[in-house]
Design a protein with these regions (language model features):
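Active-site helix of classical SDR
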Residues: 131, 170, 178
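Alpha-helical segment proximal to the catalytic Tyr-Lys
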Residues: 136, 183-187, 248
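Short-chain dehydrogenase/reductase
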Residues: 2-89, 103-106, 114-115, 207
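Residue(s) in the substrate-gating loop at a strand-loop-helix junction
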Residues: 154
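Substrate-binding pocket helix/loop in short-chain dehydrogenase/reductase
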Residues: 106-108, 115-120, 220
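C-terminal substrate-recognition "lid" of short-chain dehydrogenase/reductases
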Residues: 89, 228-257, 262
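Short, small/polar-rich loop/turn modules that mediate ligand/substrate recognition or access, typified
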Residues: 146, 186, 191, 250-252
């Protein structure tokens, strides 16, 4: 994979940070993007610039990873991150939509509108916005193209999780979107896929535990036949596979990385 270029959103921590690490270890050059600020609509801390800088510093070659602060709800900011990849490294070969937030803890009709909108705008709108600016860049690569668009969905896309209605709706939308995008990209050499993580050791799972009044996120492990939580690195390994040549025959897939949660 040496010489290929990726853009990863939500890169300061969790699955996004692990994806940057996995791609960098495989020789990719990566634009690691995150908002690096809290959202006043959400009751928990989001990724910080310090965390993003640590992701960059941990890469085998920190010069091959560029940090970018941008909001996935802002198409112009996303376009600037794509331009950074093209201007610094000559193009874009993969776009990974890993930014996500969560809110809830009460029935759908009681969720504050600002929280609900934040989840929909980041978790679904952010994926659409990334595709809007990244897919044209993937298509600008010369033929035969090997472009990859990969989004992070969730096992919540197919499960009716109480008190997390907006999150379930957004992730179901991600799964549907990548299938439609894959159909639209047919014949171009660019593919679109998603991963569907189960309960994964991330700040979002910590917040989920708080929303459910649980003592720790580890309680969710009991739901998965694997008997433990999934690690961000395990999800990132599948994302890196989908971004690579080994997944060239896969498009429109939503790949479970869920410890058997969907069984």
């Amino acid at each position: 994979m040496t010489g290929r270029v990726a853009l990863v959103t939500g890169a300061a921590r969790g699955i996004g940070a692990a994806t940057v690490a996995a791609l960098a270890a495989d020789g990719w050059r990566v634009v690691a993007m995150d908002l690096c600020a809290d959202d006043p609509a959400l009751p928990y801390a989001l990724g910080s610039r310090a965390e993003l800088d640590r992701v960059v510093a941990a890469a085998p070659d920190p010069a091959a990873v560029a940090a970018a602060e941008a909001d996935v709800r802002d198409p112009d900011a996303l376009a600037a991150a794509v331009r950074l990849a093209e201007e610094r490294w000559g193009g874009l070969d993969a776009a990974v939509a890993a930014a996500g937030v969560i809110a809830g803890g009460v029935p759908a009709w009681q969720v504050p509108p600002g929280q609900e909108q934040a989840v929909l705008d980041v978790d679904l709108g952010g994926v659409l916005n990334l595709a809007r600016v990244a897919v044209p860049a993937l298509l600008r690569r010369p033929e035969p193209r090997r472009g990859r668009f990969v989004a992070v969905a969730s096992a919540a896309a197919t499960r009716g999780l109480p008190m997390l209605a907006a999150y379930c709706a957004a992730k179901a939308g991600v799964a549907g979107f990548v299938r439609a995008l894959a159909a639209e990209l047919g014949g171009t050499g660019v593919t679109a896929n998603a991963v569907s993580p189960g309960s994964t050791q991330t700040p979002i799972l910590d917040e989920s535990a708080r929303l459910y009044g649980l003592p720790a996120a580890g309680v969710f492990a009991a739901q998965q036949p694997l008997g433990r939580l999934v690690s961000p690195a395990e999800v990132a390994a599948v994302i890196a596979f989908l971004a690579g040549d080994g997944a060239s025959a896969m498009t429109g897939a939503v790949v479970p990385v869920d410890g058997g949660l969907a069984l």
